[in-house]
Amino acid sequence: FVVLPDHRGYASNGPKNWGSAFLPAYSQGTTVFPQRENPIENLLPQAEYITSGSERDGADLLRRLNSKYNSARPGDSRLEARIRSYELAAKMQLSAPEAMDLSKETAATLKAYGLDRQGTNYGPDINVPEEAEYFGRKCLIARRLIERGVRFVQIWSGNDNGFPRRNWDSHEDIQRDHGPLANGMAIGTAALIKDLKQRGLLEDTIILWTTEFGRMPSSQRSTGRDHNPFTFTN
């Protein structure tokens, strides 16, 4: 279960959005920011003196200690979740960097996902090219993760409230916000669906496109729209 948040940060409530709820703690999502220099925090050792051998020995010792601790506390899923997270981290040290590397993707694929403007410095205003690049990158990474056996990938658009708003909670100006967000999302989403189909992955992949709730049909003060809890969209 991999989560690809908005490139500007988390949505409201942060990681609680992909917590395990009533399921065991190991069911929670793993956060990845594919546009950052280090997409997964603390994935690799920071100290030069930590070798692959010493890291493996440390992991073996930790596994034995955790097993002893866990056997004395049956039914507590928190330690099991931590154990699984370490095991996942060990696997990801080998597989994650390759999955995040887009250098072998063709120019046509990158362009389809809106990644033909990489390195552009975007201004503070919300705009289509920026949304297309960052949302498209997440869509392409999602395809690569699915190819490598990840069962569930969650892609987010829009971060927590700030000013000007860079999300879908458009109380002030719905055209300013929803226009670029929707156009940018359309580019990446269309490329992802087409790519999955061409590779035969759409045969066993379900795409669920959902939102929190809708907006009112009437304006709010001027150019914004208020919440409409009666029009959830899926």
Describe each model-derived feature in a short phrase.
Residues 1-234:
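Ligand-binding pockets and gating/stacking loops
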